[in-house]
Amino acid sequence: MGLPWYRVHTVVLNDPGRLLSVHIMHTALVSGWAGSMALYELAVFDPSDPVLDPMWRQGMFVIPFMTRLGITNSWGGWSITGGTITNPGLWSYEGVAGAHIMFSGLCFLAAIWHWVYWDLEIFCDERTGKPSLDLPKIFGIHLFLSGLACFGFGAFHVTGLYGPGIWVSDPYGLTGKVQSVSPAWGAEGFDPFVPGGIASHHIAAGTLGILAGLFHLSVRPPQRLYKGLRMGNIETVLSSSIAAVFFAAFVVAGTMWYGSATTPIELFGPTRYQWDQGYFQQEIYRRVGNGLSENLSLSEAWSKIPEKLAFYDYIGNNPAKGGLFRAGSMDNGDGIAVGWLGHPVFRDNEGRELFVRRMPTFFETFPVVLVDGDGIVRADVPFRRAESKYSVEQVGVTVEFYGGELNGVSYSDPATVKKYARRAQLGEIFELDRATLKSDGVFRSSPRGWFTFGHASFALLFFFGHIWHGARTLFRDVFAGIDPDLDAQVEFGTFQKLGDPTTRRQVV
């Protein structure tokens, strides 16, 4: 037929059987990819340290999505929360991956069947004898079925009525586990960080979808609306479907990047705004303050800080620190975290406590500046030593560690103090193993960053596709130069310009 690459889909334009076939094959490819990707990730995933080497540090992409829906165990005998298990059951990570691959195979066979047996009676219009689809009726069927699935997910899976529940955690990502969730029917259900809103919104949206589906099955569209929106044209379906997909892609890009109950930080890593706002740092200082008020020493108060919380307060876990074109997991960048060295407290020769100014997200390098409790600069690592007034040597800065591996250790030699001041710019200080994976020391993004980038990019692309196909279907007569309701047969190629009244026509 010699079609250009961007017009190859015209081969299924007036062929409902094969249109169905290629969509089933597409589902087979998507499901097959999901299952295969899950098996690949399981082959390379190391579950041994859920605190310092969680799935998001290892660049896992599909494992977090399975986990948030209630899968936590592996046939390998491990659980995502740590420890070993004896009977993971069918719905383990491998079980879900296998189910997707089996479903992919069945879809593959169904696609071949529908490609071979394309001329089915169901696709034939009784009045004309030509292949056609009752698109408003199909819309009603799909709306009803998707509403049913949506309602079922919210009412049964999420609530734990018949299903595992979903991943729920505290605001600081420390106590996450899979549990059943009760629907939140009040104003709190609209808070994106309240898990109960997931159940209530799915129940509400599912109910609406079921009712709307029944409506579209029982009520025919008015003729003027049918013609105005070109409801008989398959390209209208394409255009409106693309609209639904790009809208959803924009929404999930937002919920992923800004964070929500659907994207827990234990599974996808923290957001960049948690670093920008000092979110974890404030919580750490609050806990230390509480410890001191209970008459604990500084060392004891810092030792009670969970390593998991300290690890979130490290710039290397900020998804905005990795470049879009730096391939690989976070572990391939700054290395595998081995242990927390402890919290460094700097003091000058007058005994004032100094705080290292932290690096903002979009800086690769940043001057080392130490300020006191009032924000006054007291020490720095100068660019020009000849003109320096506040250098570590001149001010006599010392550092002492509280909590972590270096608990109680102090240093006063300037070279070591400057080393830890530079590292304190990046948040809490961790020992990182860069040898195992040959990590290059350049920060990478987390799956949160990749998901957002991918979905925002495709949403923009699909937005253009919606405009393109919507315009094609609405203005088809203008583009073709033919009135769609024309009774007379037009002889193509004989008129001078579009709409020329002298065009020769032959009445049918």
UniProtKB/Swiss-Prot annotation:
Quaternary organization: PSII is composed of 1 copy each of membrane proteins PsbA, PsbB, PsbC, PsbD, PsbE, PsbF, PsbH, PsbI, PsbJ, PsbK, PsbL, PsbM, PsbT, PsbX, PsbY, PsbZ, Psb30/Ycf12, at least 3 peripheral proteins of the oxygen-evolving complex and a large number of cofactors. It forms dimeric complexes.
Localization: Plastid, Chloroplast thylakoid membrane
Tagged with keyword ATP-binding: no
Biological process, per Gene Ontology: photosynthetic electron transport in photosystem II
Taxonomic placement: Eukaryota, Viridiplantae, Streptophyta, Embryophyta, Tracheophyta
Pfam families: PSII
Regions crossing the membrane: 21-36, 101-115, 140-156, 203-218, 237-252, 457-472
Cited SUPFAM superfamilies: Photosystem II antenna protein-like
Cofactor note: Binds multiple chlorophylls. PSII binds additional chlorophylls, carotenoids and specific lipids.
The protein's name in its UniProt record: Photosystem II CP47 reaction center protein
Alphabetically ordered keywords of this record: Chlorophyll, Chloroplast, Chromophore, Membrane, Photosynthesis, Photosystem II, Plastid, Thylakoid, Transmembrane, Transmembrane helix
GO annotation, cellular component aspect: chloroplast thylakoid membrane; photosystem II
Keyword Transmembrane: yes
Domain of life: Eukaryota
Task performed by this protein: One of the components of the core complex of photosystem II (PSII). It binds chlorophyll and helps catalyze the primary light-induced photochemical processes of PSII. PSII is a light-driven water:plastoquinone oxidoreductase, using light energy to abstract electrons from H(2)O, generating O(2) and a proton gradient subsequently used for ATP formation.
